[in-house]
């Protein structure tokens, strides 16, 4: 089947609505919407929930941008895209809770198509979701990965292990030699066996995010925390910032294509701290995190 960008866009708009509604229902606060236009073509709608009952900041962004030429970040490793017009659309979200016992979560699903007259379109899907805990709970990690495995299962036995490994490899801070979190799923350049199959998988990932995350929020939201836990959360959020600004391809693509900076950087935590050469106390729950986020098979 020929790629149908319109159908993808309609799904993404519904997905943004659905995720925002479910996060609001858990939190009690509402999202504020900010619609924007891109001068070079396209636009989007950014939604942010701030200082809610549970979430310090949750950002759920839809964007649909298009242009006559590809940015350098895309053509560097895809020379066949040179000279093509393009459309890129997606939903991207990051949730930063108040409570340090609730992990930060990130999800993204996207579609890209590049065309030129007289040639077949070049298209693919990408996306995934990943979890960044501050305090490790095995049952949360197992639930997160089991949900990921179950949504992958109808698409083949090899899908979950392949995209889990890709996620572990991608969300890695090379300059720190450590994982960002416990991973989940990451896929990109998905265009086989056909459009319908790939679109179905992208929808499964997008719809699976709240099933993976919200039970963890419910399980941890009543846990009591204090200044110690908060300081550790802010310190670890620094790793999140480092990854997004140094390593994340999506951030680079957005900035190079003249995307909306406020929306691109919506993933940043509202508060964060760095402390020179800080080390957690031996044997403490904070010290246990470095072992907890090591790559492993959770299920």
Swiss-Prot record:
It is found in: Cytoplasm. The record marks 175 as: Important for dimerization. Residues 240-275 are annotated as: Important for dimerization. Keywords: Cytoplasm, Heme biosynthesis, Metal-binding, Oxidoreductase, Porphyrin biosynthesis. Its EC number is 1.3.3.3. Belongs to the aerobic coproporphyrinogen-III oxidase family. This is Oxygen-dependent coproporphyrinogen-III oxidase. It comes from Salmonella paratyphi C (strain RKS4594). The gene is hemF.
